[in-house]
Amino acid sequence: MTAPSKPVLVADIGGTNARFALADVDASVPLLDDTSREFAVVDFGSLGEAARYYLDQIGVQATQGVFAVAGRVDGDEARITNHPWVISRSRTATMLGFSTLHLINDFAAQAMAISLLRPQDVVQVGGASWRPAPIDQARNYGVIGPGTGLGVGGLIIRNGRCFPLETEGGHVSFPPGTPEEIRILEILSEQFGRVSNERLICGPGLVNIHRALSEIAGVDPGPLQPKDITARAAAGDPRSSRTIDLFCAIFGAIAGDMVLMQGAWDGVFLTGGLVPKVLDSLQHSGFRQRFEHKGRFSAIMSKVPSLAVMHPHAGLLGAAAYAVDAQRQHPGEQR
């Protein structure tokens, strides 16, 4: 590994694991993949301690950082639900001896990653073909990702600058599109009261859909995990297969609604831990039909590309993209 002369430490901090890598803001491929490492958060008392351990392990000293955090960033602090760390930007920067440290939301990082994605990093799920455009070309993108929850965001590119949109679109009310989905909504309403998109389109959402289908059929499915449903679907179980089909169709409807709300005409990027696991189903399901089925806008929607992000470290890539964008805005900051 050859470290850049002025490396930027980038991180993707989740509820269970912390991933670190180095970035070179002057390189054509800023994220240095061979420097990435992953650690369990429970093994360290703080974010600064984990970051220092990483830097010591690879033998590099950085003075700049961009850390993406799976939680809300409020001023100097970031909070992650059920997380052992209290993350303070100023205290972490002081501990590491950093002159500059940015804390950003993890889905802002997912959005920023779009600016560095290459064709080999994505798989087409429908619509017009997509290729990266010059940074000075105006574009509007959407990003949506089911994992433990449902993240929704966007990226606006103007005059060579990237502006991530941080939203809570996963908590928008679920709009059923078929009689079957209306019945599922009724069942979930009895359990949750208000039903958001996140109640269906995420890992636990797979379980919610399956349980609703089981109740409709008058059977008890027993204890279930999302991985049980995907495994049973792969083995040909009809109810699990129907669960995956509904998941993909509803996912498509929600992603299409996001395009209309954000004006994300240049493409929607599907990210998150579940996407690679259901990729084949997304490509051969009702995802695109529901994505495009938007009344008077159906013809326009048919041209909007939807792309599954397959980059293994999209969060780190987005943190690196943020560092590159900061360099464009304040050239002296990263020097």
UniProtKB/Swiss-Prot annotation:
Instruction: List the catalysed reactions.
Output: D-glucose + ATP = D-glucose 6-phosphate + ADP + H(+)
GO cellular component terms listed in the entry, alphabetical order: cytosol
Q: Which SUPFAM superfamilies match?
A: Actin-like ATPase domain (SSF53067)
Annotated S-S bridges: none
Looking up InterPro entries in the UniProt record yields: ATPase_NBD (IPR043129), Bacterial_glucokinase (IPR050201), Glucokinase (IPR003836)
Q: Name one GO biological process term.
A: glycolytic process
User: Which branch of life, at top level?
Assistant: Bacteria
Which keywords has UniProt assigned to this entry?
Answer: ATP-binding, Cytoplasm, Glycolysis, Kinase, Nucleotide-binding, Transferase
Family under the similarity heading? Belongs to the bacterial glucokinase family.
Any idea what this protein is called?
Answer: Glucokinase
